[in-house]
């Protein structure tokens, strides 16, 4: 018998997360490691747990995540979106609540490219009037 699970994909910056939601006791595993071990920063862990806390499902699911690309913040944001999408696949009634909190929206902000003749994307050389 196959294990029933819900799936959601999340992306942020250059990070991608594949999230699998199963009935369980609240364990969150990212790339084979527990959430607390994978993310050193508490803020990243809080970001990941937000959709579960909002829908009061912290103890009802085991979550298996595969995160790739980007850095800590990007991966945390990608996982959050993936969890939100998987929760909606599990229960459609949660969608309005999650959308209102902003968890269903893909954060479209990307790194602006460096321009030729400038130091960075917008940082130019110091201007001298004389």
Curated annotation (Swiss-Prot):
GO terms for molecular function: RNA binding; structural constituent of ribosome. Gene3D superfamilies: 3.30.230.10. Keywords: Ribonucleoprotein, Ribosomal protein. PROSITE patterns: RIBOSOMAL_S9. InterPro entries: Ribosomal_Su5_D2-typ_SF, Ribosomal_uS9, Ribosomal_uS9_bac/plastid, Ribosomal_uS9_CS, Ribsml_uS5_D2-typ_fold_subgr. The keyword Ribonucleoprotein applies. SUPFAM superfamilies: Ribosomal protein S5 domain 2-like. The keyword Ribonucleoprotein applies. It comes from the Bacteria. Pfam families: Ribosomal_S9. One of its GO terms (biological process) is translation. GO terms for cellular component: cytosolic small ribosomal subunit. NCBIfam families: PRK00132.1 (NF001099). HAMAP family: Ribosomal_uS9_B. Belongs to the universal ribosomal protein uS9 family. This is Small ribosomal subunit protein uS9. It comes from Stenotrophomonas maltophilia (strain K279a). The gene is rpsI.
């Amino acid at each position: 018998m196959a294990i029933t699970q819900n799936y959601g994909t999340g992306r942020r910056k250059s990070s991608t997360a594949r999230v699998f939601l199963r009935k369980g006791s609240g364990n969150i595993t990212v790339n084979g490691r527990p959430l607390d071990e994978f993310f050193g920063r508490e803020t990243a862990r809080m970001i990941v747990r937000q959709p579960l806390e909002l829908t009061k499902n912290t103890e009802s699911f085991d979550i298996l995540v595969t995160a790739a690309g980007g850095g800590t913040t990007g991966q945390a944001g990608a996982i959050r979106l993936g969890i939100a999408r998987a929760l909606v696949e599990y229960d459609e009634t949660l969608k309005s609540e999650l959308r209102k909190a902003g968890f269903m929206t893909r954060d479209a902000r990307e790194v602006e490219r460096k321009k030729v003749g400038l130091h960075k994307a917008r940082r130019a050389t110091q201007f001298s009037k004389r």
